[in-house]
A protein has these predicted regions:
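Structural preference for solvent-exposed beta-strand-turn elements
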Residues: 7-13, 22-235
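Extreme N-terminal basic, low-complexity initiation segments
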Residues: 2-6
């Protein structure tokens, strides 16, 4: 619990240990009391957002050369996504907080289960793999079946673009029998992941695609900006 008041800041451990809890507190509840009236100043370096970085890394699959991402956070999920891309055939080089991703030699559309199962965001490679190859084999996070996790909206949106799916032992196999075609899709919920996968597949589809009730989080805007920089038209 956090109590905000004027003055100094103090941390109370086991506020109710005396036998009489403070007003509004339960016995043995830890409390931070913050008392202000001091000017806040200084500088802080803000790390890049993981949710944006992972999806921009996935979007690099759509390119045929080098993608450079700056201000990438140094966290384990970024390393895992780098490994996923490398297994697909990409070259990933880290220089501090900068990633250089060359996808010219990506020649596989199947992600390794042992990596994908460790990271929920790995489902985001589905859309760009379909966009580049017209097919994909992506192990679902945790090997779950459809419906066990919130990926159904991803599939509904991609199916509207012309993708056909089959599931075998936790592996999602996607094909495009008649190619990708532009469409109009209404998402029952503004799912961030579904919006991202649809965007990355739709930019290679024939015709225009409209996504109604799409998510509009900052990472969606970052992804749209990158796709536009790669030659797409997203608005």
């Amino acid at each position: 619990a956090f109590f905000y008041n004027r003055g100094t800041c103090e941390y109370l451990h086991d506020a109710g240990r005396s036998g009489v809890p403070a007003k509004g507190l339960e016995m043995n509840q830890e409390v931070i009391i913050v008392r202000g009236n001091h000017t806040l100043k200084g500088d802080v370096r803000v790390s890049g957002a993981k949710n944006s970085a992972l999806k921009l890394m996935a979007a690099s699959i759509l390119g045929q050369g080098e993608t450079i991402l700056h201000n990438v956070p140094l966290i384990s999920d970024i390393e895992l996504m780098s490994e996923v891309l490398a297994r697909l055939g990409a070259t990933v080089v880290r220089e501090g907080h900068t990633l250089r991703i060359n996808t010219a030699d990506v020649d596989s559309c199947e992600t390794p289960y042992e990596l994908v199962s460790k990271m929920r965001a790995s489902i985001s490679v589905l859309g760009p793999l379909i966009g580049r190859f017209g097919e994909a084999r992506v192990a679902m996070p945790g090997g779950c079946q459809i419906g066990a996790r919130k990926i159904d909206m991803h599939l509904v949106g991609l199916e509207a673009l012309g993708v056909a799916f089959d599931v075998d032992h936790g592996v999602l196999a996607a094909t495009t029998p008649n190619g990708l075609r532009g469409t109009h899709v209404y998402l029952e919920f503004p799912s961030v992941g579904a919006t991202e996968n649809m965007l990355m597949a739709a930019v290679t589809a024939e015709g225009h695609t409209a996504i109604e009730n799409a998510a509009c989080e900052p990472e969606i805007e970052d992804l749209a900006n990158m796709l536009n920089a790669m030659g797409a038209r997203v608005s």
